[in-house]
Amino acid sequence: MLEKLNHYRQTLTSPLRQKPSQNQFRFGWVDNLKELQEVQRFRANQFSHQFGISFEDGLDQDLYDFGCEHAVLREKWTGEIVAYTRLKLFQGHEIGQSYSAKEFDVVPNFSHLPSILEIGRTCVHPQFRSGKALSMLWLNLVPKVLWSMRAKYVMGCVSIHLEDNL
């Protein structure tokens, strides 16, 4: 398995090596409270428009935010956020503390596993939902997830708007 992972790492084309003309986005990690509040406002806007949810103070915030790493994709020229997700690494015995554990009974199935990455609150601005922005966001997560966090498993919750509730 390690051999396959090393082969994958060698053949992976980093999104940072793309031609500048192909990339209209800038990827980064939230590293201060001002940026955290900016992504919380972005999340609130996306979720309120899509699901009709209202947020106190216009911020989608919870206790998980302070223990997570926050990935942001911005439009290169304006600096506006176009896509976002948050990450938290758990060991199996900690999985009951995850956001997913609030929504699903994950403890019996995941508590024995090492290095579980929870991804959540992912959202993309409606003008950028063609797939390119989300692809760029995920591609930029790969180095962190594989090399820094060394995640072995990935889990998370997703909210999807369905037309006519089908």
Predicted segments, located by residue:
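Polyanionic, low-complexity segments and short acidic motifs
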Residues: L2, K19-N23, S159
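A broad, low-specificity signal marking well-ordered, structured residues that form hydrophobic/aromatic
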Residues: F25, T85, L117
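Acyl-donor binding region in acyl/amide transferases
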Residues: F90-L166
